Amino acid sequence: MNIELKKATADEIPLIQQLSESIWRQHYIDIISKQQIEYMLAKMYSTEKLQQEINSDLHTYFIAYLKDKPLGYIAISKESDNKIMLNKFYLLQEQRFHGLGKKIFELVFSNYPQSDIQLFVNRQNFKSVNFYFKMGFKIADVIDNHFGEGYYMNDFFIVKKTH
């Protein structure tokens, strides 16, 4: 299984949006309300927001491909010389539970071998939480962040130490 992570440019914004809409609407429907899904998609994945993130290097987006077929994407920001934030890690529903997430993580670990990896994951997102635990992440904190319009992100802040 040869997965490739290709750095995304502004040209891939429509693909990131398409993947996001499919993934979020399928995966989060049992975790948060449909209204919150739509609100968060509009806020986080507008063309303007993605252009700002990609063009300013706030986040580095990578699209995961298997045989030239997009499977999902990740977004990483470097917090310090020895810390990265995995801001986004999403796979299409039909691509889950085939070992692809683990392969993508292996690529991330190999690209950032001396960096602790940290991320936020919704506390009710049990499948993802369990996946991260299997990958060696530990809960560092429990966070409730107001996202706007009365919506909250009820997350675990988790970390995988590499050193």
Give residue spans per PLM region.
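Conserved GNAT acetyl-CoA-binding A-motif
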Residues: 105, 111-122
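C-terminal "cap" of GNAT-fold acetyltransferases
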Residues: 118-129, 133-135, 142-163
